């Protein structure tokens, strides 16, 4: 098989029923197979798939392993040159697949790519989870072409060029299977959130490219599994971000970045408290505690990542403070940040 489009599902019967017909119709290429892996859903997802889409192979996992381990377990059962990790709440478009495949086939130096993500509920806007490709600042804060923190741009074609990026969104991530496993796959310990960024960092550190191909467009609902306002999402984002930094930062930067993040995370917690967001306030504090508890378990991963790394300098990990640019200099779009 050349391309396996794998949807990891958890209680997403409604999403699958809504978006699967378009996916099947728009993915008719030789060597392409759509597969649904199920994280032990308690709804009728599997029964619905067997009834409505019997041609789609199903992989049943015995419990909810989360995004990272769920995908790893599913992909070990799939033989393909390319994997496409696709969220169940993504609606593809007529010509979404060909630009991705065509580019990857002639650029062997590129490990992974993503399409342009637009918001399904606001289709003229970029979507939060990936926009037109992601970057990271000096202190570990993420932003995209088309989205800086909560400032989301309208898509007026301003980012319609193919561009190297630091990370590609897990909502629709095309990756060579060889690169996926060479980098170790998604980190099971993350459970969910930022695990695709961690994977992309490991691939970039090995001098493998990641790009956004905006000729390909998909629409993403976002928050279908875990709502943005859920304190558990806040916890996972803060904890996993710290673990990712610890795993991947060059030795020369680790101490300074982690010291700065200690103060910045404290400031974020106080801002949540000032807004009476008690759940988010406690989530940040819990994330710090969990990071300290888990840190020894990640020491071997850090050592291995540094040994495998071919470079300390990744241009798409930009050397400025996003917080300073956004809140002090009022630069709230990708274009204003980079010009």
Please annotate each region the language model reported.
Residues 60-78, 88-90, 99:
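Glycine-rich, basic loop-to-helix element that forms the pyrophosphate-binding segment
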Residues 160-217:
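A short, conserved alpha-helix in the catalytic core of glycosyltransferases
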Residues 6, 206-303, 307-324, 328:
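Active-site-adjacent helix/loop segment of glycosyltransferases
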Residues 31-40, 59-61:
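Short beta-strand/loop segment that forms part of the nucleotide-sugar
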Residues 91-130, 134-141:
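Conserved donor NDP-sugar-binding/catalytic core segment of glycosyltransferases
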Residues 22, 38-47, 63:
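A conserved acidic beta->alpha catalytic loop
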Residues 21-31:
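Short, acidic, metal-binding catalytic loop of nucleotide-sugar glycosyltransferases
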Residues 83:
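Short aromatic/hydrophobic "clamp" motif used to bind/position activated sugar donors
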